[in-house]
Amino acid sequence: MEEAGLCGLREKADMLCNSESHDILQHQDSNCSATSNKHLLEDEEGRDFITKNRSWVSPVHCTQESRRELPEQEVAPPSGQQALQCNRNKEKVLGKEVLLLMQALNTLSTPEEKLAALCKKYADLGNSPLL
């Protein structure tokens, strides 16, 4: 995957994005004689540039990919570590569920709809094999 190639370069990409935003800010400071509207426009363009060109790679994805790339690290962890890793995986899955639930709740307009969605999700989680 393309994201796996970026894992080792995450810090460098952050530094690059930060340096580009710093260059944009320096450019704004050098044009002090311009009107304030021009500064606002440049500031918005700078934010758009940073937002469009920055992509985040999940640290979880990076660690999983690095384990696949390095076969000598594929030694089975002791049972205590397996239980800990299993709990972490459950937390990650539940965290994603919570995020999706919050996004779904934000799309609903009435409190009744939100309550019904929460009750349905609670029932679904009660039947889930994760718990």
Curated annotation (Swiss-Prot):
Q: Domain of life, per the record?
A: Eukaryota
Question: What InterPro entries is this protein classified in?
Answer: Taxilin_fam (IPR026183)
Q: In which tissues is it expressed?
A: Ubiquitously expressed.
**Any one GO molecular-function label of the UniProt entry:** syntaxin binding
Belongs to which family?
A: Belongs to the taxilin family.
PANTHER family, per database record:
GAMMA-TAXILIN, TAXILIN
Q: What is this protein called?
A: Putative gamma-taxilin 2
